[in-house]
Amino acid sequence: MTAVSIRRPIRILGIDPGLRRTGWGVVDSDGNRLVYVACGSVEPRDTLPLAERLLAIHDGLAKVLAAHAPAEAAVEQTFVNKDGAATLKLGQARGVAMLVPAMHGLLVAEYAPNLVKKTVVGAGHADKTQIQMMLKILLPKADPKTADAADALAIAITHAHHRGAAQRLKAVGA
């Protein structure tokens, strides 16, 4: 007698952190099958002090988690640019983006921007237009209103793709 494995879809939250706009996207993943659930962005007012903007990102993402109940989350890694102060502020937004799902007990994975692009488009230096075109193919029902929401969906897709490979490696003891 063989054991029957009942595979269930897993709900994944992708997050593209930013101080002006933090994109989020939710997909259900069942093996190679992806189903669009929702996407949007948290947009704190530019006039708020930094601490209040971070709080707005926290509260917005907490509402997304409450509304969509993801099982896992993925966040894009921060790239370092020439403006050190801007990089530090983006890092603070990214910290909040990682903290909120972790506070809800979720696994939080991190992916480099080039890996996200390579996974979704097939090229590590793809532009935002190419990502949005591939999203229409991979998630036909998705209609992200911002590039940040589209990027967040791409991050969720990347996690769906790579989590399976990581689980297979773990299963064989690699």
From Swiss-Prot:
Its main location: cytoplasm. Mg(2+) 2 binds at residue 76. The keyword Magnesium applies. Keywords: Cytoplasm, DNA damage, DNA recombination, DNA repair, DNA-binding, Endonuclease, Hydrolase, Magnesium, Metal-binding, Nuclease. Its cofactor is Mg(2+). GO terms for cellular component: cytoplasm; Holliday junction resolvase complex. The keyword Manganese does not apply. The active site is at residues 16, 76, 148. Its EC number is 3.1.21.10. InterPro entries: RNaseH-like_sf, RNaseH_sf, X-over_junc_endoDNase_Mg_BS, X-over_junc_endoDNase_RuvC. CDD domains: RuvC. Disulfide bonds: none annotated. It is found in: Cytoplasm. It catalyses: Endonucleolytic cleavage at a junction such as a reciprocal single-stranded crossover between two homologous DNA duplexes (Holliday junction). Binds 2 Mg(2+) ion per subunit. One of its GO terms (biological process) is DNA repair. Mg(2+) 1 binds at residues 16, 148. One of its GO terms (molecular function) is DNA binding. The RuvA-RuvB-RuvC complex processes Holliday junction (HJ) DNA during genetic recombination and DNA repair. Endonuclease that resolves HJ intermediates. Cleaves cruciform DNA by making single-stranded nicks across the HJ at symmetrical positions within the homologous arms, yielding a 5'-phosphate and a 3'-hydroxyl group; requires a central core of homology in the junction. The consensus cleavage sequence is 5'-(A/T)TT(C/G)-3'. Cleavage occurs on the 3'-side of the TT dinucleotide at the point of strand exchange. Homodimer which binds Holliday junction (HJ) DNA. The HJ becomes 2-fold symmetrical on binding to RuvC with unstacked arms; it has a different conformation from HJ DNA in complex with RuvA. In the full resolvosome a probable DNA-RuvA(4)-RuvB(12)-RuvC(2) complex forms which resolves the HJ. Belongs to the RuvC family. This is Crossover junction endodeoxyribonuclease RuvC. It comes from Rhodopseudomonas palustris (strain TIE-1).
